[in-house]
Amino acid sequence: MNRNNQNEYEVIDAPHCGCPADDVVKYPLTDDPNAGLQNMNYKEYLQTYGGDYTDPLINPNLSVSGKDVIQVGINIVGRLLSFFGFPFSSQWVTVYTYLLNSLWPDDENSVWDAFMERVEELIDQKISEAVKGRALDDLTGLQYNYNLYVEALDEWLNRPNGARASLVSQRFNILDSLFTQFMPSFGSGPGSQNYATILLPVYAQAANLHLLLLKDADIYGARWGLNQTQIDQFHSRQQSLTQTYTNHCVTAYNDGLAELRGTTAESWFKYNQYRREMTLTAMDLVALFPYYNLRQYPDGTNPQLTREVYTDPIAFDPLEQPTTQLCRSWYINPAFRNHLNFSVLENSLIRPPHLFERLSNLQILVNYQTNGSAWRGSRVRYHYLHSSIIQEKSYGLLSDPVGANINVQNNDIYQIISQVSNFASPVGSSYSVWDTNFYLSSGQVSGISGYTQQGIPAVCLQQRNSTDELPSLNPEGDIIRNYSHRLSHITQYRFQATQSGSPSTVSANLPTCVWTHRDVDLDNTITANQITQLPLVKAYELSSGATVVKGPGFTGGDVIRRTNTGGFGAIRVSVTGPLTQRYRIRFRYASTIDFDFFVTRGGTTINNFRFTRTMNRGQESRYESYRTVEFTTPFNFTQSQDIIRTSIQGLSGNGEVYLDRIEIIPVNPAREAEEDLEAAKKAARQNLFTRTRDGLQVNVTDYQVDQAANLVSCLSDEQYGHDKKMLLEAVRAAKRLSRERNLLQDPDFNTINSTEENGWKASNGVTISEGGPFFKGRALQLASARENYPTYIYQKVDASVLKPYTRYRLDGFVKSSQDLEIDLIHYHKVHLVKNVPDNLVSDTYSDGSCSGMNRCEEQQMVNAQLETEHHHPMDCCEAAQTHEFSSYINTGDLNASVDQGIWVVLKVRTTDGYATLGNLELVEVGPLSGESLEREQRDNAKWNAELGRKRAEIDRVYLAAKQAINHLFVDYQDQQLNPEIGLAEINEASNLVESISGVYSDTLLQIPGINYEIYTELSDRLQQASYLYTSRNAVQNGDFNSGLDSWNTTTDASVQQDGNMHFLVLSHWDAQVSQQLRVNPNCKYVLRVTARKVGGGDGYVTIRDGAHHQETLTFNACDYDVNGTYVNDNSYITEEVVFYPETKHMWVEVSESEGSFYIDSIEFIETQE
């Protein structure tokens, strides 16, 4: 359309009226955009710019049939495929108009009604009138409001100003809200979900309209006045709804298949019809949902629908069944009941998944009869894309002569018209195919002919036309220009048998045509101006060990699976752009296991990276099971015909890897530089700071600040020098704010195990690494534990810097770890375990700098990996594998009587564990409120009550232990031991001290508990008593804590242990233990022995000096204690005797007469007169 001698491509947003264009901004374009539209076939028809082709292809004055809704489904998909090949622009307004006119051709709901009626017919089930009425009413509301939105959008695009922008934004929001409200009426809500299968085409078409709408927020949102946060929210909703809508459609589709799966030929016929028609009206559309992601496909792309559809077998099937037994549809003929069933037809006519094929040659084998040539066999020759190897499949009777030899070569067979019959008589029934014409895109018509109508009633004859089931894109125009599918294969099932108990015979020949979408690019063309889709099934070669398997329903075709190390296949591509053009590779996969992915071009590895699993083994594939990831290292092709191979290595166990497609993305340095600048601005300004720019957003982590700094550092100095300078100032300010709010001391790990009270305390095995590709600052490395000695590092955040009833968050980044335990301890503990795979392996190479790494490309790759973690729904096990982590803990009332800080503990307790992590920070999130505050107050009150109870108990134990220790000394300074006490009293006091609980943290023994101070006080005094006791005892190792050191023994003597108690055991009458002592002659000594005798006989402890003076303490089982109480075999008693040695050398000897003798301690101490 021209106005004032101006072409539309010269003026963006040119108004369509004749009024002055005062508010139109003119932009000169370097290239005529029409140049890219030359030499187009049916897409030229679809892409025409005027309004001529926004009208429906269904006559609104006629009723809408089942074939019509198939026509609508094919046309909508074809229209979208055409427009996906161009950048998103105002041209999409014509798509809106086309879709609305196609779905509401008469401004009524006849098409939507026909969608439901067709599925009702296929599955033989009726939808509730109430559900149907509600759905149609809601569709009417959507139509009205969609028209209002498109009208406002078109007016704003042609005459942009603030008022029109406000109006279109308002109508956008209203329409989005209505879709959110009405979508449950189409099969996902509680009132309609029982009819989800019947409503599947309705749901898919409505979902498509909603996702198509949401993409406009990315295209126009900023010009409407939306801020970036609002635009991002719409984008996130678009992605989330893509997942929701896709999963619903796949479930409804599969439920319908399961419901139709039966045992008879008729059930198979309906099953195949449902499979084909739901593919054309719903599932093809679902496969296009991801391509509305403007951020992923900014320059357009070429979606490839590689799926196959099977038209009905070419056999007699009248629209109305006769009342007689003659001339009935083949699948309900009772004579075939014993020969045709569901499984026979499915296994004979439907091929297993395979690589995408192109038909090369077709031979029809015929039997010449009086009626003409009957089709009885087929030879199908085909090849994989860009393969010179011809494959061949044969079906039916192969001994018959060739009636037609059709060389397809580089043409398409787009239509097949056949004459079919059911010759029925008392002697048998036969279904035959006679005249058949194959229409080629070259204009040639080939086939078998010569049929004469002899002996067959007209009612038993029928013409079958493939376009009745696969309509062309424009039924009013030439099919040769507008066909939608091309023939890719013909399967066939033929049988002939004699009926049981009858001389009559039955026979049938059932050729079945297999079709692929015409839009599939048969050359795998790589262009320099848009993203190229390469489904892996378009390979010319399948690697050994790789298997083509049925797709999950939303990929538009089958996928390739691999369960071990090796390749997937090889794709030959045709490069049309200059060989200097650089590209990047993106691919879509699902996996139950971690793996290394390799891409080679012409034998040279261009990318490799380690990727993580996306689902659990045995789990059903859903939309979220498939992940799209991108390599950052660019490459270029070296020849116009090149080969891309993909393979996997380094599988972490048994599992499955599914590969859907790879995408070839042209690198546009200028645009990517602009995108880098916008990403840096977003990271440095919008994502870090609060609105007032005086603080960091609460959810921002120190790691994110560092990564924002990396993004800014990677900006070009030449192009964006000023922007870079300002953004660097911003991220430096953000880093300072990050440090100021961090409650951890020394977050850079400059000093460990310092003498300061707080700060980092660590065990052996903790090292600090400097720099590296994953951390801008220092990082911690924790080695594996040694037997019972964990590797740990911890720090206490003092209570003085904390606030009561406030939430705090520990953030960090883990490069990789195994069995890393992260604990936050306050009055309660928050425990986190991280098992993070070492999958951040770069596919980049050195940039020649002294650091030896290209941090810019490195960061892009890391960000791509982290992006999958952020958007992939995870269970608790998967969350433990994420690199970034945050752990939250709430404070209570900060009871002043307890030293309530927050302990941050990192440890590895296993011998095969390890960890590398950094960017640790403990930050205040904010005060608790509402239910969180009430819950914390209740928990804190319970803890305080329990603390009071424990303290009362500990106070009782503390008082008893303190009194027992006081009794050990004769002075207040604990410098002199009470001469009356012995080891038994010390052990008794020790047992009381050890009964104090809460001395150390359960997490790490190096962390003191709430009773650590009183325990330390008593332990120090007890240690003093033990020292004084050992010092005064002339007997060395008299408590046997060092085994038999210092003692002379026979073989029948040993030292045993019971808890903290060691005791000497003599278990035979000839056992003997002795020790020589040095003493002060003529001084008073006391020999004190604590022991017990078991069994008969006596036990003896004898002391003697060099003058042959001696004293003996005797123990037996009949001993009484000092109070006259009987002592049993399990009780120890203490005996003592005074001795005045006359020489400085003495000897102590231990022996027994029979039984066993247990000695707890032997003392020989000097006492005051």
Swiss-Prot record:
GO terms for molecular function: signaling receptor binding; toxin activity. It comes from the Bacteria. Pfam families: Cry1Ac_D5, Cry1Ac_dom-VII, Endotoxin_C, Endotoxin_M, Endotoxin_N. GO terms for biological process: sporulation resulting in formation of a cellular spore; symbiont-mediated killing of host cell. The keyword Ribosomal protein does not apply. The keyword Isomerase does not apply. Keywords: Sporulation, Toxin, Virulence. Toxic segment of the protein is located in the N-terminus. Belongs to the delta endotoxin family. Promotes colloidosmotic lysis by binding to the midgut epithelial cells of insects. This is Pesticidal crystal protein Cry9Da. It comes from Bacillus thuringiensis subsp. japonensis.
